């Protein structure tokens, strides 16, 4: 029997900077009202003179994740993204690792992203932020383990 996959079981974790050996702690991304992945394929299109149709091939990806969140105090992930917005950080100061986890299979994909600020304060009831995470590197496939019910995870890359 097929199982409908629920959105809340596809989790995202953000690399909050730390002084540990990895340089970050993968912390669950909570309070997000939007986390939409865009694959943005890079295409090679060619039309040969002896063929009626054009050929299209995907030659790469420029993956991005559009985000939006309600700003909650005392949340490390939200505070870090808000700091990038508010202080207009650039370059490596605005790069973070994001891990996407499928709790149905235990599979995970880790990738570095640049935090691209968009808007802030566009709701009259609560303070909000939105923008995009844009890929800056290849994906690393693997699995995760957790000892705190997915508040944080440890990623192990496939070999």
Regions found by a protein language model. Give the residues of each.
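Solvent-exposed edge beta-strands and adjacent loop segments
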Residues: 1-68, 115-127
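"Short basic amphipathic alpha-helical interaction patches in structured regions
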Residues: 79-88, 112-114, 129-130, 147-148
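Secondary-structure transition/turn motif
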Residues: 30, 70-71, 133-137
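Short, acidic/charged, Gly/Pro-enriched secondary-structure junctions
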Residues: 77-109
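Short beta-strand and beta-hairpin "edge-sheet" elements
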Residues: 99-139
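Ordered, amphipathic secondary-structure segments that act as subunit-interaction surfaces
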Residues: 63-84
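Short, flexible beta-strand-to-coil junctions
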Residues: 16-19, 70-72, 100-107
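Intrinsically disordered, low-complexity terminal/linker regions enriched in Pro/Ser/Gly
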Residues: 143-159
């Amino acid at each position: 029997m097929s199982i409908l996959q629920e959105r809340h079981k596809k989790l995202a974790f953000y690399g909050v900077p730390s002084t540990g050996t990895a340089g970050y702690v993968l912390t669950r991304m909570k309070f997000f009202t939007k986390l939409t992945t865009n694959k943005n394929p890079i295409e090679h299109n060619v039309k040969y003179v002896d063929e009626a149709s054009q050929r299209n091939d995907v030659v790469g990806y420029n993956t991005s994740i559009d985000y939006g969140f309600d700003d909650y105090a005392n949340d490390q992930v939200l505070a870090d993204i808000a700091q990038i917005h508010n202080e207009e950080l650039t370059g490596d100061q605005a790069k973070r690792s994001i891990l996407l986890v499928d709790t149905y299979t235990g599979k995970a994909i880790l990738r570095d992203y640049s935090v691209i600020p968009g808007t802030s304060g566009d709701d009259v009831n609560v303070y909000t932020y939105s923008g995009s995470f844009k890929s800056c590197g290849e994906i690393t496939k693997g699995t995760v383990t957790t000892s705190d019910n997915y508040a944080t995870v440890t990623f192990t890359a496939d070999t």
